[in-house]
Amino acid sequence: MANDTNPKARAIAAFAEMFFEKARTKTSLSDLEREAIDLGHRCMAEALGLALEALDAHLSANRPKGLRSHDIRPRTLASEVGDVSFSIRRYRDECGCDVYPLADALDIAYGTRISPGAAEFLVEAAAHVSYAKAARLLARHGSSVRPQTVMACMRQAGRLCAEQDEAAALSLYRDGVVPEAESVEKELCMEADGTYFSVQGAAADDAPKRLEVKAMVAYAGKEARGGKVHRKRCAHHALVGTPERLWSEGVASAVGRKYDLSKIERVHLGGDGERWCRDAGRYLPKAEVAFHLDPWHVNHAVLACFADSKLAWNILEVINDGGKEEAVALLEACLDEGLAREKQARSVISYLKGNIDHIALDGPSLGTMESENQHLYGVRMDSFPCAWSVRGASDMARIISRRESGAQVPGCTREGSKGERRRGRREGKELSFYEKQGGSGKVVKSIGSGYLPPHQADTRKMAPGKAYALRKGMAIMDRGI
């Protein structure tokens, strides 16, 4: 052994000895690797439990005065290395409220049965695969949990994301506080679109069968990298809700974290022509916003008018060359000659005329939103048979958009996990304690201005009679007569 005094060296030597004993009975590296990981995780889980107990003992020995010992409780947390079991000391403060020094020091959420690392793993995994598969991935070399536990982790993460996004929107649009940003760009590209997914419990005739996830993305142009064109520094945001929530939260929380909102001068906004897709300008009042009709939607609409795609591409070439009005006239002529499908052609003609000022404008290349909806949200939420609740779909969309933006999905804190009932019980105990103290304080009654100190004045240079009258009057005022 190289160094007997180094804990890391001793641990490595102990593992090497255990792995050697395993290797002597194995015929393949695959079996050895699997057993080595399982053995290592079991040892790590047990060692982590012992370390937590040692830290608890240290904190208890240095606890604040006034805490009295109540009991020692067993605790088990599911983690990425298996179940971590340990004992935790519980104390009571002067108000009769429970105090856990270890949980307070390590910010362990109330009532949780999952470690923060395992919860983070489940949220990340469930954003790619089903809840059942995410649970199996954790159980491969860690703790076993139910799919319902994975769903609870997603719900919690989605709720925390929504709270942060809403707080960012209020801070910007109500309080006028511009968020701190990572970079500065004078010109941005933005795109917005909606995508639909199946709704749970839509068997009733009057129940909606589909829900819409509204999504937006902002990026600082495109660049060639590795033989492909990539968008630069994307900021994503998506939810199930109103356009107002999408834009206010998306601009304040997602875009505002990436780009300094006060420095943005021009925005190229792409969309399919829906009214809500054009609304970004309302939330970026200092920027000049130019709306571009998404070329993908133009191509898709014109191609749907013809059985022969060659005719469609002839019209699209005219559009791309700048002849928007000429292309519409050509499509009308094809309709009159019976070369185009009547129903589709009439709809597309109306669509193109209604957006004629936003077709084939000068500016950077856009047209990425349709593929984004498929590759970010559709690949998880619509790629295999499943249906979503409104809240579940919104939570998933928020989490996926955060992941793709490189932003951290918030975890549950001890303070945030208290809940209204726990908070109310604690406040009740504290109030009862202070009420029983009696005479510990006196609230001075006043009207309008809160507490006012007794009236005083310098009477040393006043005549005795006048000084007496002034002091008497002030005393009467102090007594409230």
Label each residue range with its predicted role:
Residues 29-39, 54-65:
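Short secondary-structure junction/hinge motifs that connect adjacent elements
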Residues 56-111:
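An N-terminal low-complexity regulatory-tail signal and nearby short nucleic-acid-interaction modules
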Residues 1-49, 90-481:
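Catalytic center-proximal scaffold of phosphoryl-transfer enzymes
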